[in-house]
């Protein structure tokens, strides 16, 4: 899931107008705000967020210094005949050499500004580009020109609709958008669009249960998140990284206990959990870690661990076959622990039987420190 960032542009108008943009961004989950140097500390008083400032030095203490305003980038100064003579390029280079995180700001007026932006992108950590009239073509060209560089391209937009287009341009899209809008709903919608596009889908398939066996006592892990999950949502858990079961959240009421929709009673301490395109051991998770929440259609979203509970409980072995692959998971033996059935309906492990079909995720290759590698490995 490639993260798409949303920056809020708040460098014009009075402080009260800027403050409204910033607070809406903070409350909605924006990633960064772009302000003038004199407003950096004011932003920090409002909340904890990355602060970028238009400047040519780092006296403001901003997290990111953005070069280009009142320079060549926005057309205040003419573009140089040669890049080595550029006012903005030299300023960005000096800051980069000092270890400062630098953004380059360029307003695309014509092809010459597009070429200038590409040069800034080779120096800066972030390239903030916007247009006098919004067009996709300059963004496509810059993505193509800078695809081998480490720079992140942040494209200037004025609406959530423009943001969606920027995120989806070419295969990769912009890394983020710089939203210039004082409309609170537009800010919320843009951030929502970014988060939805981060939520890639993963392919799930059904496996046939071949064995259900009580094992006795062992240590199991509950993942309590800062997120509320729906029926059919949970996490991918298993004893093999090559194949994991969709374990349902405790989102259903039962005769014995109230629903805890923030929780996935995930499995024994040795188990793998799939997070993004990597795996981790359940037992190494801790508060503040990111996890991947997935539903029965394969749609993913990010969750945050609020607490991990490891307790001794009776365990149960679940074995299933998908094609010629045999998968296993060891879960707590309790009525409230459920796998997700083929049709998206949760099935309690207490009622699970041979022949039932449950949703799983299959992977090829092996894992080395959680990363997928091409290697033959047998896990039983």
Curated annotation (Swiss-Prot):
One of this protein's Pfam families, by short name?
A: DHQS
**InterPro entries in the record:** DHQ_synth (IPR002812)
Q: Which reaction does it catalyse?
A: 2-amino-2,3,7-trideoxy-D-lyxo-hept-6-ulosonate + NAD(+) + H2O = 3-dehydroquinate + NH4(+) + NADH + H(+)
The answer on whether this UniProt entry bears the keyword Amino-acid biosynthesis reads yes
One annotated GO molecular function: NAD binding
Q: Which UniProt keywords apply?
A: Amino-acid biosynthesis, Aromatic amino acid biosynthesis, NAD, Oxidoreductase
Q: Which GO terms describe its biological process?
A: amino acid biosynthetic process; aromatic amino acid family biosynthetic process
EC numbers: 1.4.1.24
Q: Is NAD set as a keyword in this record? A: yes
| Function text | Catalyzes the oxidative deamination and cyclization of 2-amino-3,7-dideoxy-D-threo-hept-6-ulosonic acid (ADH) to yield 3-dehydroquinate (DHQ), which is fed into the canonical shikimic pathway of aromatic amino acid biosynthesis.
Recorded family membership: Belongs to the archaeal-type DHQ synthase family.
Which HAMAP family does the record cross-reference, listed alphabetically? Answer: Arch_DHQ_synthase
Q: What is the recorded name of this protein?
A: 3-dehydroquinate synthase
Q: Which organism is it from?
A: Methanosarcina mazei (strain ATCC BAA-159 / DSM 3647 / Goe1 / Go1 / JCM 11833 / OCM 88)
Cite the source lineage.
Answer: Archaea, Methanobacteriati, Methanobacteriota, Stenosarchaea group, Methanomicrobia
Q: What gene does this protein come from?
A: aroB'
């Amino acid at each position: 899931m490639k993260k798409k960032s949303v920056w809020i542009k708040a460098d014009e108008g009075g402080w009260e107008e800027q403050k409204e943009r910033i607070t809406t961004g903070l409350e909605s989950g924006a990633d960064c705000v772009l302000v003038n140097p004199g407003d950096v500390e004011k932003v920090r008083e409002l909340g904890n967020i990355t602060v970028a400032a238009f400047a040519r030095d780092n006296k403001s203490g901003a997290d990111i210094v953005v070069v280009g305003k009142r320079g060549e980038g926005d057309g205040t100064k003419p573009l140089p005949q040669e890049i080595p003579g550029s006012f903005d390029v030299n300023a960005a280079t000096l800051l980069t050499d000092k270890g400062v995180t630098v953004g380059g700001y360029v307003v695309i007026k014509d092809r010459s500004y597009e070429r200038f932006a590409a040069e800034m992108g080779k120096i800066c950590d972030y390239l903030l580009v916007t247009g006098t009239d919004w067009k996709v073509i300059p963004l496509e060209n810059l993505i193509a020109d800078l695809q081998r560089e480490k720079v992140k391209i942040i494209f200037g937009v004025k609406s959530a609709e423009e943001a969606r287009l920027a995120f989806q341009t070419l295969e990769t899209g912009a890394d983020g958008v710089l939203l210039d809008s004082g409309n609170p709903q537009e800010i919320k919608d843009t951030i929502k669009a970014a988060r939805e596009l981060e939520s890639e889908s993963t392919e799930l398939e059904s496996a046939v249960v071949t064995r259900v066996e009580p094992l006795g006592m062992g240590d199991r892990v509950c993942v309590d998140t800062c997120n509320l999950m729906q029926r059919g949502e949970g996490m991918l858990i298993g004893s093999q990284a090559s194949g994991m079961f969709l374990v349902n959240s405790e989102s259903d009421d039962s005769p014995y206990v109230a629903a805890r929709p923030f929780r996935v009673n995930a499995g024994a301490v040795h188990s793998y959990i799939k997070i993004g395109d990597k795996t981790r051991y359940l037992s190494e998770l801790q508060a503040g870690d990111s996890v991947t929440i997935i539903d029965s259609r394969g749609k993913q979203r990010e969750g945050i661990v609020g607490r991990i509970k490891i307790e001794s409980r009776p365990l149960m072995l679940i074995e299933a076959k998908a094609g010629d692959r045999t998968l296993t998971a060891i879960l707590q033996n309790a009525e409230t622990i459920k796998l997700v059935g083929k049709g998206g309906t949760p099935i309690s492990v207490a009622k699970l039987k041979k022949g039932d079909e449950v949703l799983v995720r299959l992977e090829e290759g092996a894992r080395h420190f959680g990363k997928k590698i091409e290697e033959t490995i047998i896990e039983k």
